[in-house]
């Protein structure tokens, strides 16, 4: 299902993960949490993003590999164009404040962060 909006493309895939996959991924996320970060050079206000992140794609997990393959297949996307799969954990009161994911062209980070494509999924 695609939500119609002139501002963003959001897709919903009902039952994309089964209950067992959800349980396994949730458990994996809790094993390697680190403070979530933002793309920024130097010091920044850490209250912008207060969640924790797990880089699931760095874990050697069959369930994560299967889900990654399913995502790439559904989008007809070669795996080399996808980002490392991540999972986020938010405790009560934690947040990722309103922001824009873009580089304006003058940003020194553009070279580093636009060499590889990326897709975000929120489960």
Where do the PLM segments sit?
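Fe(II)/2-oxoglutarate oxygenase catalytic core
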Residues: 1-123
């Amino acid at each position: 299902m695609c939500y119609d909006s002139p501002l963003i493309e959001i897709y919903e895939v009902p039952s994309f993960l089964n209950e067992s996959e959800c349980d396994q991924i949730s458990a994996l996320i809790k094993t390697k949490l680190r403070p979530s970060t933002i793309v920024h050079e130097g010091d920044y206000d850490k209250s912008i993003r207060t969640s924790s992140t797990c880089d699931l794609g760095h874990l050697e997990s069959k369930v994560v590999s299967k889900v990654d393959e399913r995502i790439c297949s559904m989008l007809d996307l070669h795996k080399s164009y996808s980002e490392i799969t991540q999972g986020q954990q938010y405790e009560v009161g934690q947040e990722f404040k309103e922001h824009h994911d873009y580089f304006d062209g003058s940003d020194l980070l553009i070279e580093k962060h636009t060499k590889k494509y990326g897709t975000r999924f929120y489960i």
